[in-house]
């Protein structure tokens, strides 16, 4: 398969192919322009993969530009987090990190150009009055009484804004377009507003800040962006994007193209709602493993490769749709099934004693991956007292139950065949110990007499067990579309986090955050980067071995 054939196909790439073939562009230059007022989520990952992926495939460039035009909501913490997320996903921006604030001087000059052309004016309506004058989708707006000020007066007032002569909310600069436009975004949009706030890049140099729609298009043009890619909610804004560039003296006029944003089941993407989850302590932070943030997914154990694969599979269209959570989980499950080493851990332990086992114990050899001999093997201690999972034993069971049953046999993974002989219970009737015998001639081989032992269960030697905390993470919400609920907080899944105390094989004491394991027969887990200690490792469940929610949706 050629390089071109291996590339994903979508309407944006078709446009790029046509632009290159026609000579309209000789290279491709994209950008990813997040606002540094929060943490990136899986929806941003789609945009990152699209913009950086296109630049990569077409041997072009992709800028990382922070849209830092609102100093009240932005912070250097978010800047560093976003840079880290982009790099973790496997992408690298062209040249230095850029900021919209790099262009504040040019933006100010372009605003003055619009004033000089009679295309912008200083308005002294209050924000409430501006909203009232703007009209509705069915009613046209009406002109501000300040709309027809002279060029000279507007220049003087804009300078007064710049030098701090107005209080916040007392004046703004607006484009003079058409208050009767069927598109509300074109009804004299605000270009500059006053904010007396220190900026994380420019300090206190400015007290007027440009709006996104004014900044975005000019920044694209100044950077030589060829294809400006936005989500569909900016479709109407394209008219303003083009209006600004058509009416200022700038040599380059990029084109904006819109694609559908990512909507994912069982979560919310709204920054406001995510912030509410954090501030009201429904989750422990932006990197809580239940959050759809990139930092949350990373802490849960998602790999960059699995997120890139997910973004590739869902594709790029103009059609809004909601992606099943199972699609994302399938990508990480496939990745980890292929690449994660195996280990044994018991999540709900019950003691099992092998009464006829002699000696202190022994080491058994286990492959790190059943299908990849190149991943090697490890030595796991075995002894006469082990932990097994409580769900792997029943006193009575039907033929479909392939685990340990009283009076019957089962194989211990990569070890011996055992037979359950009797149990010991506490005063409440709970089983505390299972007593067994073992066949000493069945270490990793079938019984010599040819009898069939069908079930296989995992185990951990009690004498060598590593105590661990296991965090069983699940979907944060109990309904597919929590955003549609009257109160999205009311549909939080009460079992989105279940904490268990269990035991693991001793090799897991060397586990490091960011490296996943398949806990055999349980699922995929990784060491938690926040709560783990040397004395008590904490493992997060990334995803189960199979989609347990499939039946829920049926």
From Swiss-Prot:
It catalyses: tRNA(Gln) + L-glutamine + ATP = L-glutaminyl-tRNA(Gln) + AMP + diphosphate. This is Glutamine--tRNA ligase. Its EC number is 6.1.1.18. PROSITE patterns: AA_TRNA_LIGASE_I. It comes from Escherichia coli O7:K1 (strain IAI39 / ExPEC). One of its GO terms (biological process) is glutamyl-tRNA aminoacylation. One of its GO terms (molecular function) is glutamine-tRNA ligase activity. L-glutamine binds at residues 67, 212. Its main location: cytoplasm. It is found in: Cytoplasm. Belongs to the class-I aminoacyl-tRNA synthetase family. A motif ('KMSKS' region) lies at residues 268-272. Pfam families: tRNA-synt_1c, tRNA-synt_1c_C, tRNA-synt_1c_C2. NCBIfam families: glnS (TIGR00440), PRK14703.1 (NF011291). InterPro entries: aa-tRNA-synth_I_CS, Gln-tRNA-synth, Gln/Glu-tRNA_Ligase, Gln_tRNA_ligase_bac, Glu/Gln-tRNA-synth, Glu/Gln-tRNA-synth_Ib_cat-dom, Glu/Gln-tRNA-synth_Ib_codon-bd, Glu_tRNA_lig_a-bdl. The keyword Ligase applies.
